From Swiss-Prot:
Keywords: Iron, Iron-sulfur, Metal-binding. This is Uncharacterized protein MJ1349. The keyword Iron applies. The keyword Secreted does not apply. Pfam families: Fer4, FrhB_FdhB_C, FrhB_FdhB_N. GO terms for molecular function: iron-sulfur cluster binding; metal ion binding; oxidoreductase activity, acting on CH or CH2 groups, with an iron-sulfur protein as acceptor. PROSITE patterns: 4FE4S_FER_1 (PS00198), 4FE4S_FER_2 (PS51379). Residues 11-40 form the 4Fe-4S ferredoxin-type domain. Belongs to the FrhB family.
Amino acid sequence: MRLMKSYKNLKEEVWDTNRCSGCGACVAVCPVNNLYFREESPVKFECDECSCIIVPADIVEHPISAEFCKTVVYDVPCGACYDACPRIKKSAIPKPKGLGNILKAVRAKASIEIKNAQNGGVVTAILANAFDEGLIDGAIVMMDDKWTLEPESYLALSKEDVLKSAGSKYLWKGPILKALKTAVMEKKLKKLAVVGTPCVINAIYQILSSDNDLLKPFREAIRLKIALFCFETYDYSKMIKKLNEDGIEPWEVKKMDIESGKLKITLINGNTVEYKLKDVESAMRNGCKVCGDFTGLTSDISVGNVGTEKGYSTVLIRNKWGEGFFKRAVYNGYITYDENVDLEAVEKLVELKKKRVKKD
C-alpha cells in the first residue's frame, strides 16, 4: 500500500534541509494552489476582516503552504507536490557517471538570425524549427526584463515568442516552472518543450517517471527536455546589489557566462566584468550547493558554452528523441554543426561541480 505524502513530507525532506532548487514543480502541480513562493505571494498584507489570514512569509528560498492542503486537512489522497520533486530522499533521478548517456556530441550554431542569442543560439533554433514544423505547441523558457534583468517564467506559443526570449542570465527570482500549470491546465497544450537548468529538467524527469494520477496531464503534455549547462544560479536581489555596488546598472548587462572558474558579465558597450566564483558565492542559491549535475543528465539534449569557442554551443544529444529534434533543425537549415568539440573541458567542470557537493 502506497503511503500518502503531503507538502509536510516535502518540507521535512527538502525545504527544511536547504535542498530546494526553486524549480517550482511542486507549486505548478498542486491541484488546489496551496503552495507558492514568497515572490508570488497571493497575500501581501494581514487582513483583519476574515479568519483566513496568510501572513507574508519570511525571506526563504523554498515554497510556502497557504495551509489548505487537502491531504493534511481532509485526508484526501494527493501527493502531487511530493512526487514531482527531484530532491526527495527516494527520487527517480538516475546518477550516471561523467557526462552520462550521449549518442553524439557536436559543436553547433544557429543558421538563422537570433537577437540576444546566448553563444550559438542552438536552443532557440531547435525550438523555432519545432514550432515551424508543428512538433511542439508551446515551450517553457525563462525571459528577463531587459531594463531590470528580472527573470520570469515564460510560455512561448510561437516561433516569434521563442526568438523574443533568447538569452539567459542565470538569475533566480521566481520558479521557471510557474508557466507549467498555465500550459497544461489552462491552455491544454499537448506538445510542450521545457528548457531549463539541470534542476528544472530533473523535476520534469521526476514527473514523467511518476505513476501519480494527478501528474498524468503533465506527463502527457511534455514532449521535449532541453538542459542548459549550469554551475550555479544567483539570487536576483543579491546579484543586482553586487552589480550596483560595482557601478553596474541592470540595463547595462548583455549576458552572463561562467567560464574558467569565473562569472563573466558582458555589457552592452562591449566591455566585460569578471568575478571569481568565490567572490559571488554569497549570492548563490542554497539549493545549488547540493547539486552535482552540470550538464543536465536527464535531458533529451544538453546545451552549453563550455567546450567550444565563442559563437558556438556544445550540444550533447542524449537519446533518439533529442536526436530527432536536432536533426530536423539541421535538415531545415536552422542549425549547422561539426564534431569539433572539446569534451574534456566539459568533463572538468562536471567533476568540479561534483567535488563541490562532496566538500559541502
